[in-house]
C-alpha cells in the first residue's frame, strides 16, 4: 500500500504542473488585465507600464509561470489587483465553500444512496418508476432555476429561510444552498446506486449469503451495499472538487462569499492572480480526492489489493 501511495503521489506531480500551466495560459488569453483595471477609459501608457512591471506582466508568459510556481511553493499566491493578498482571500473564501460542499455531500450520501438502495431493491415497482422520473426532472432543470425558485418560495414568499446568506455563512443558513448545489449530483448518485444494487443483488456472493440464512439487513449492508458502493464512491470523490469549483451559480444566487464568488469576481475583473491562485488549490483538491477514492476501494472490496 505504501509503495502504491508513493507511486500515485509521483504521478500527481506532472498532472499538477500540466493542469496549472493550462489554467495559467487560459487565464492569460482572457484579455489585458491592466485594461480591465482602467475600466471603460483608456489607461495612461506610463501608468499601464508601471502596473505591468509591478505585477510582473511585462515578462514573457513562460517566465511569469515559473515565477508564479516558485512563489506557490513558498506559500505566496500573489497579490490581487486591489492590493489584497490572494492567500487572505483564500482564508476567507475556502472555509465557507468547504462548509457548503460538506452540506451538499451529506445530502448526496444520505438521500442519494438511500433512494438508490430503495429503488434498486424494488426495481420495476411504482416507487422505482416514481423516483426515476423525479431524478430525471431534477437533472433536466438547471441549477440556477432550482436555486432561484427555492429562494423565491422559501425565502421571499414564505419566509422560512433568509433569501441571502449572512457574511459569516453559518451552517444552518447553508442547508438550502447545499441542497441546491447537490441537487443534480444527488439525482445521479440515486440512479448510479440503483443500477449497481440491481446488478449486484443477483450476484453469487449475495445468493450464497441468503442461502446461509443471514438476516436480510446484514445481507444488504455487509455484502450487497458494500460492493455496490464502488462506482458511487468514484462519482462522489470526483464530485467534491466539482462542487467546490462549480458553486459559482449557487453562491451568486444566495450571496455566499466563497470560492465561486471570488472566481466570478476574478474573471469579471480579469484578475489573473486571483483566478489562477484559487484554481491551483482546486486542482490539488481534485488530485487528493482521487487518491483517497482509490485507497477507499480496498476498504469497500477486500479483493482489491495494491502492491
Where in this protein do the model-derived segments appear?
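N-terminal signal-anchor/signal peptide hydrophobic helix marking the start
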Residues: 6-15
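Hydrophobic alpha-helical transmembrane segments of membrane transport/permease proteins
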Residues: 15-66, 158-176
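Residue-level recognition of pore/gate-forming positions within transmembrane alpha-helices
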Residues: 12, 20, 43, 109, ...
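Alpha-helical transmembrane segments of integral membrane proteins
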Residues: 2-4, 92-127, 143, 167-307
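Membrane-water interface segments at the C-terminal ends of transmembrane alpha-helices
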Residues: 22-30, 56, 70, 133-162, ...
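An internal, D/E-rich "acidic patch" concept
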Residues: 57-113
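Small-residue-rich alpha-helical segments with characteristic i,i+4
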Residues: 15, 122-137, 141-143
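Membrane-interfacial helix-loop-helix junctions in multi-pass membrane proteins
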Residues: 52-62, 76-83, 87, 163-171, ...
Amino acid at each position: 500500500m505504501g509503495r502504491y501511495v508513493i507511486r500515485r503521489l509521483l504521478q500527481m506531480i506532472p498532472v499538477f504542473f500540466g493542469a496549472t500551466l493550462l489554467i495559467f495560459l487560459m487565464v492569460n488569453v482572457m484579455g489585458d488585465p491592466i485594461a480591465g483595471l482602467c475600466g471603460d477609459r483608456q489607461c495612461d501608457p506610463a501608468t499601464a507600464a508601471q502596473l505591468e512591471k509591478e505585477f510582473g506582466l511585462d515578462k514573457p508568459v513562460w517566465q511569469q509561470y515559473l515565477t508564479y510556481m516558485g512563489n506557490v511553493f513558498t506559500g505566496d499566491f500573489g497579490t490581487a489587483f486591489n492590493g489584497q493578498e490572494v492567500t487572505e482571500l483564500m482564508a476567507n473564501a475556502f472555509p465557507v465553500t468547504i462548509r457548503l460542499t460538506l452540506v451538499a455531500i451529506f445530502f448526496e450520501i444520505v438521500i442519494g444512496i438511500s433512494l438508490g438502495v430503495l429503488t434498486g431493491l424494488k426495481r420495476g415497482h411504482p416507487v422505482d418508476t416514481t423516483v426515476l422520473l423525479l431524478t430525471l426532472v431534477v437533472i433536466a432543470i438547471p441549477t440556477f432555476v432550482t436555486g432561484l425558485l427555492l429562494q423565491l418560495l422559501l425565502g421571499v414568499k414564505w419566509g422560512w429561510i433568509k433569501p441571502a446568506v449572512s457574511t459569516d455563512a453559518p451552517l444552518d443558513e447553508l442547508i438550502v444552498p447545499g441542497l441546491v448545489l447537490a441537487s443534480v449530483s444527488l439525482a445521479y448518485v440515486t440512479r448510479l446506486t440503483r443500477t449497481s444494487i440491481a446488478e449486484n443483488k443477483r450476484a453469487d456472493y449475495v445468493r450464497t449469503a441468503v442461502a446461509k440464512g443471514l438476516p436480510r439487513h446484514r445481507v444488504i449492508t455487509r455484502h450487497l451495499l458494500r460492493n455496490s458502493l464502488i462506482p458511487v464512491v468514484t462519482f462522489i470523490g470526483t464530485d467534491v472538487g466539482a462542487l467546490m469549483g462549480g458553486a459559482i451559480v449557487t453562491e451568486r444566487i444566495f450571496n455566499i462569499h466563497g470560492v465561486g464568488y471570488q472566481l466570478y469576481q476574478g474573471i469579471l475583473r480579469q484578475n489573473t492572480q486571483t483566478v489562477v491562485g484559487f484554481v491551483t488549490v482546486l486542482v490539488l483538491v481534485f488530485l487528493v480526492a482521487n487518491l483517497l477514492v482509490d485507497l477507499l476501494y480496498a476498504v469497500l472490496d477486500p479483493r482489491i489489493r495494491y502492491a
